[in-house]
């Protein structure tokens, strides 16, 4: 089980990203638009740099929904390999069958 503080920190980053995503996208569009004047693009770069780091999508870590484990997660299930195996062996994951050949 991961520390509650690290799980909460990641949730806070997700919230910040959700709130600032539109503004970040607008600024990035201005920065990438070569038809805009250089001064306007530079001003957009400065505004983007002033935004909180935690509002960036790259700061978000995929974590297991049950345990909070940060490594070896399956995106589709939002579970770590350990939690997925445990739930799968109990028959709680639809369509998941134990491999045998």
From Swiss-Prot:
Disordered: annotated segments:
1-23
Source species, domain of life = Bacteria
Q: Which UniProt keywords apply?
A: Ribonucleoprotein, Ribosomal protein, RNA-binding, rRNA-binding
Where composition is biased (Basic and acidic residues), the residues are 1-10
For this entry, the protein name equals Small ribosomal subunit protein uS14
Similarity section: Belongs to the universal ribosomal protein uS14 family.
Q: What does this protein do?
A: Binds 16S rRNA, required for the assembly of 30S particles and may also be responsible for determining the conformation of the 16S rRNA at the A site.
Summary of subunit composition and partner proteins: Part of the 30S ribosomal subunit. Contacts proteins S3 and S10.
One example of a Gene Ontology biological process annotation: translation
Q: Does the keyword Transferase apply?
A: no
Gene Ontology annotations for the cellular component aspect, listed alphabetically: cytoplasm; small ribosomal subunit
Q: Where is the composition biased (Basic residues)?
A: 11-23
